[in-house]
Amino acid sequence: MTDPNPKGSTSKEGFGDWCLLEADCSDVENDLGQLFERDTDSDISDLLDDTELEQGNSLELFHQQECEQSEEQLQKLKRKYLSPKAIAQLSPRLESISLSPQQKSKRRLFAEQDSGLELTLNNEAEDVTPEVEVPAIDSRPDDEGGSGDVDIHYTSLLRSSNKKATLMAKFKESFGVGFNELTRQFKSHKTCCKDWVVSVYAVHDDLFESSKQLLQQHCDYIWVRGIGAMSLYLLCFKAGKNRGTVHKLITSMLNVHEQQILSEPPKLRNTAAALFWYKGCMGSGAFSHGPYPDWIAQQTILGHKSAEASTFDFSAMVQWAFDNHLLDEPDIAYQYARLAPEDANAVAWLAHNNQAKFVRECAAMVRFYKKGQMRDMSISEWIYTKINEVEGEGHWSDIVKFIRYQNINFIVFLTALKEFLHSVPKKNCILIYGPPNSGKSSFAMSLIRVLKGRVLSFVNSKSQFWLQPLSECKIALLDDVTDPCWVYMDTYLRNGLDGHYVSLDCKYRAPTQMKFPPLLLTSNINVHGEANYRYLHSRIRGFEFPNPFPMKADNTPQFELTDQSWKSFFTRLWTQLDLSDQEEEGEDGESQRAFQCSARSANEHL
């Protein structure tokens, strides 16, 4: 306890009486019971809140903070990789181009309470300061090929989301015309075409100039021009190529990526497109090599063909089919369509609406002319005409050796063949019989083939018109005659085998009066040994082929029964067969000009 008398304290001097150096002790406070029973209220009560706590909205606050942080990181990445500088480097005008239509914004009546993402974007958009950048100047003049800064162009192309649209925009900006206006689209990469339009972006100057020389070995015609970073090629290849082959050639030659290439075939029937290529080669910046393609020349260059009328001349089509020996409608249609690039009349036929009608009528007229020509010829003139159509040379000895191989006297056979060709009554039918695989059909078919004869089939005997081919040939063949056929011939064809006139029923026509042409038969049955067909013995001359057809070690025929062999046979034995000399066929001074069925006058240009 402190002394109540302050005079006895000398430890701290200089403080005066205002400072209490020791606290006074009270005995009353030593009682713990009274201390706890006393009221504990003070002026700073309720400093700690002992009430029950609630969760509140801390989870939503945490979610909002996470979204703001993620959006901030995303915006930093966008500013880093999608800078407006990249769009300006690629194309100054591309920034204003939008592929999707702009939708009008709708005004909201009530603002919704969301996570604050939209507010964050709006605030960041307001804070962005617009940047103005001057486009880089290309080191290459506008009308020269190549590119001064390839890396910049290629990098800007890679940053584009739609590379094809970007290339087309650059092409139109450079050449002033759309790429699709000059080309037609091939969806498949495997479709072949000889002509291709190729546009390449960002090519080195040296490679661009060297391509003008390297492409000449692959193409008949080359058109090349470069403006800015775009290079345009019109390539007419010597052979058809697909898009993959063209890209492989261009990428290896120009050292570019396939994404830098646009390639489509050109429009062949568009006059405006043809004029673009024709006028483009007249400029100083264009390079061309070779003659103009036909589709450009026909639409741009005037000549004597342009003065001709574009009407279709049916007689010219008939004359063409007659000269080329085309009788079937499919052959006439296909071959005449292929003639269109060379013949103006074929082009007019393709443009006509009645192509099928003209083809049917043309085939009918050619058959009429051929049939009339055949009837007007003698057998000597017919054989002379047909063997002259055979190309190449053979040896007649193969046929003679084969006849002797079958144990037939050649003089007897030659006499029978002479009477057979001249249709001597009861001598105009020859039968070749023998066992199978003896060469009967091969020998007969080779003779019919070289003389352009017709083949009859007994399988059509139920039809009353099955003998109609006899009215359209100079020689006929009935192969592999069996017993039913012999019965039919013994019953109905005796007059025809005699060489007399018969009434032959032809389709769509009245029965025709005519004689049978020389008829060649093959069979496994010797009709002369059958008593049932005794009335045919005097009408048919038979020769037996008893020996099998010989073959070489390499499984080829030992005797070549070809068209060339028969050509040599008839030429060698022309006199022995009693065939007339062709120089003595007509009257003296008669012209030997070819048959003309067209309506062209003599004073027209050739």
Swiss-Prot record:
It catalyses: Couples ATP hydrolysis with the unwinding of duplex DNA by translocating in the 3'-5' direction; ATP + H2O = ADP + phosphate + H(+). Residues 146-309 are annotated as: DNA-binding region. InterPro entries: Helicase_SF3_DNA-vir, P-loop_NTPase, PPV_DNA_helicase_E1_C, PPV_DNA_helicase_E1_N, PPV_E1_DBD, PPV_E1_DBD_sf, Rep_E1_papillomaV, Znf_lg_T-Ag_D1_dom_sf. The modification Phosphoserine is found at residues 83, 91. It is an enzyme of class 5 (isomerase). It is found in: Host nucleus. Its EC number is 5.6.2.4. A motif (Nuclear localization signal) lies at residues 78-80. This is Replication protein E1. It comes from Human papillomavirus type 5b. The lineage of its organism: Viruses, Monodnaviria, Shotokuvirae, Cossaviricota, Papovaviricetes.
